[in-house]
Amino acid sequence: MTRQFTLVSLLLLSLSSAALAGSACVAFDISWNLLAFGLGGKDYNAGTKDSWASGSAKDITTSGRPPFDGTNTTCYLSQFYNAIYVLNADSSNPSNIYIYNAASSSWSTQTVTTGNFDVSNFVTILDHDTNIFYALSKGELFSLDMGSLTSANSSPLSWNDIEAPTFTTTGYNPVMAIAQNHIHFLDVPGNAAGTANIFVIHFSYFQPETQSYGSNSFPASHGQATSFFKDSGVQEEFAFIPDDGSATYVVSVETNTTQTLAGPSTKDSGATYFASTDALVQLTSSGAVSYISYNNASTEANTAATWSTIANLASVAPATSVASSSATGTGTSSVKGAVATSTTTSTSSGSNGTEGTGVAIVSLGLSLVVGSIGLLLL
């Protein structure tokens, strides 16, 4: 009987680990303090990069926060206003956007009218200058204007349908990055490796031709993308990490070139990412947080850079030790998001939009777990 209950406990722990994959997120404030939300039911401020190697992150959990029980929770920094916008953090109210005022360490809840926007199926970025979310949902580009919000309005905001992209979206599991007020769509079906389709935000215009980022560039495969901030001004570089974690690619939209850095130590297709000016942070499906340093002035330093654990977060919120399919596999999981891009999709996708069966596998896995528990208790 003891062995049976031990197995049941492990199975339940596996389920909780799977839930963690989409329920936590990380972000930076404008002083480049790393904030981790929803780790073990709490929120933490890990401080700036020079403090990550030791000590304990500060507990900043307070009232008004979201429950962090969504399946694809993602965080976005509004640099002009030092606010963190959190999407998909409340399974009971999935359209709500929670606002964390980093200056006052306070939360508020912004209601949102969705219209034709599908909150269960979208990918989004937050534009630096306009403070507008742009999202691709079921083949349509939508926008939501956050204005100058550091706390919620009493009136709801609205998702607005802009137009359909000029490129094909059939079977496309979007990968989106923001740089120079342009949205870069990676891994579009039919596109070559190292290329992207571009939407010019300020002119509301899809460029008719694709953009290339060098001959030794990123692969044509699904992955996660996030932009490197600057102390002031728009982002000019973004990182792309393919789902297999084989490398980290940093793309400069100023020179249309790509650097190749080490891939994360944990190969996790369900991981999410967020970048400051000089660090790229990974949050894995099990809640482990690590980073790699980045120097936009030194290719040599970037080539030599390696990934390290953020120790002061690990000391207060250790990652779960249960291995899951998303924590060790190299495929594409549909139960995931992307920090700085939110991926909420009903199907998974491989290279150039080949649809997979992630949801079916997850559902089957959960059914087997529940069935196993029932048999063990007999």
Where are these regions (language model features)?
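Cleavable C-terminal sorting propeptides in eukaryotic secreted/cell-surface proteins
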Residues: 349-378
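Repeated scaffold domains used in trafficking and secretory/extracellular systems
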Residues: 20-28, 64-81, 114-128, 165-175, ...
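Blade-loop segments of beta-propeller domains
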Residues: 54-121
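Structural motif
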Residues: 36-53, 83-100, 138-147, 191-202, ...
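N-terminal signal peptide
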Residues: 2, 11-27, 373-378
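A short beta-strand motif characteristic of beta-propeller blades
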Residues: 55-67, 106-115, 157-166, 209-218, ...
